[in-house]
Amino acid sequence: GLGEAARYLMRIGMDNVLEYLRSLQSYGEKLLRETLGDEIEIYSPPPDRGAGVLSFNIKGLDPHQLAFQLDLEGIAVRSGHHCAYPLHRSLGIEKSVRASPHIYNTYEEIERLATALARIRNRYVSTKSFIATGRLCSSC
């Protein structure tokens, strides 16, 4: 139960937990930027001040739809304003996607997230291109 979970975290050490979460966040931000370039907007605080959370949007994609597509890929995230509407308003956005990895998550799972986001973005770009041109690719 809850008591055992607390004992488990105390055995690991909260400083170690925070260090690992920040490491996952740093790796995730780097990978998302490498994978999606200018198309990703990351709103998380810098990893040295964060708690491992990755908050982001992909330009042109609705956060709720993005979260739904990630769910279809077996990746759990949240979308919306996350009880932080004033923060979202100050960022000039209404909602975002949030991935909240913890000590049971791995670097490989962060890679899965980046790969899935690229796949979803590519599907969207192909669909958008098809709607605009009636063709699935520019050379067709």
Segments predicted by a language model, with ranges:
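Pyridoxal 5′-phosphate
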Residues: 1-140
